[in-house]
Amino acid sequence: MNDNFKKQPHHLIYEELLQQGITLGITTRGDGLSDYPKNAFNMARYIDDRPYNITQHQLQLAEEIAFDRKNWVFPIQTHENKVACITKDDIGTNIDTLTDALHGIDAMYTYDSNVLLTMCYADCVPVYFYSTKHHFIALAHAGWRGTYTEIVKEVLKHVNFDLKDLHVVIGPSTSSSYEINDDIKNKFETLPIDSANYIETRGRDRHGIDLKKANAALLIYYGVPKENIYTTAYATSEHLELFFSYRLEKGQTGRMLAFIGQQ
């Protein structure tokens, strides 16, 4: 696949950004220690897996991306739209064990160097933000709830520079095969973007939704230049050899870890 995300042993990396001091990527599912599912490279401590496995996977990833795990930060995601400002004081949060810190956070941003923002995914959209000019990075977790509640808009509220200097990467997530019902479709139709561009009715109470397109449309609506947004062609629901898919695997699966940091 011709994509800016390049395959590595246990992750995909946005390779061209490395020269700019940005480490941006997402883990893949295979060649791990977990039995959930078998031989999975699961990165989530909050599912039925041995803590040892997660720690070993973290150490492996830290070596592959050359970013010490002591500098990672992980929130407790709850499918909402709250954003946290992260500083070097937060590094190490929820990496060895889960705590009450950063609970209910589905987006983070920082202007600090040597901090790796991380969150878990298994169909939801990872939205990465960066500006090398202003030394800003952010990461958002946008499932249908986060998309509907405009989590990308909430992140943009914390950008204190001209949006022409902001770049956004929309990462691997479910495709338009993801279906919603009438009630959820009606919610999306209240957003300030044309739902016809990302929702397709397929039958009674059945509508396909492309959450990548919805988030891109929201970003453009709120002022991010279209040419500054990159959307990967990778889809969790279409590349099960690479990714976990919560919906296709009926919840019995692991989680990938999306990450972004700046040197």
Curated annotation (Swiss-Prot):
<dbReference type="InterPro" id="IPR003730">
    <property type="entry name" value="Cu_polyphenol_OxRdtase"/>
</dbReference>
<keyword id="KW-0560">Oxidoreductase</keyword>
<dbReference type="InterPro" id="IPR038371">
    <property type="entry name" value="Cu_polyphenol_OxRdtase_sf"/>
</dbReference>
<feature type="binding site">
    <location>
        <position position="79"/>
    </location>
    <ligand>
        <name>Zn(2+)</name>
    </ligand>
</feature>
<dbReference type="GO" id="GO:0016491">
    <property type="term" value="F:oxidoreductase activity"/>
</dbReference>
<dbReference type="GO" id="GO:0017061">
    <property type="term" value="F:S-methyl-5-thioadenosine phosphorylase activity"/>
</dbReference>
<keyword id="KW-0186">Copper</keyword>
<keyword id="KW-0862">Zinc</keyword>
<feature type="binding site">
    <location>
        <position position="141"/>
    </location>
    <ligand>
        <name>Zn(2+)</name>
    </ligand>
</feature>
<comment type="similarity">
    <text>Belongs to the purine nucleoside phosphorylase YfiH/LACC1 family.</text>
</comment>
<dbReference type="InterPro" id="IPR011324">
    <property type="entry name" value="Cytotoxic_necrot_fac-like_cat"/>
</dbReference>
<keyword id="KW-0378">Hydrolase</keyword>
<keyword id="KW-0808">Transferase</keyword>
<comment type="function">
    <text>Purine nucleoside enzyme that catalyzes the phosphorolysis of adenosine and inosine nucleosides, yielding D-ribose 1-phosphate and the respective free bases, adenine and hypoxanthine. Also catalyzes the phosphorolysis of S-methyl-5'-thioadenosine into adenine and S-methyl-5-thio-alpha-D-ribose 1-phosphate. Also has adenosine deaminase activity.</text>
</comment>
<protein>
    <recommendedName>
        <fullName>Purine nucleoside phosphorylase SACOL1200</fullName>
        <ecNumber>2.4.2.1</ecNumber>
        <ecNumber>3.5.4.4</ecNumber>
        <ecNumber>2.4.2.28</ecNumber>
    </recommendedName>
</protein>
<dbReference type="Pfam" id="PF02578">
    <property type="entry name" value="Cu-oxidase_4"/>
</dbReference>
<dbReference type="GO" id="GO:0004000">
    <property type="term" value="F:adenosine deaminase activity"/>
</dbReference>
<dbReference type="GO" id="GO:0005507">
    <property type="term" value="F:copper ion binding"/>
</dbReference>
<keyword id="KW-0479">Metal-binding</keyword>
<feature type="binding site">
    <location>
        <position position="124"/>
    </location>
    <ligand>
        <name>Zn(2+)</name>
    </ligand>
</feature>
<comment type="subunit">
    <text>Homodimer.</text>
</comment>
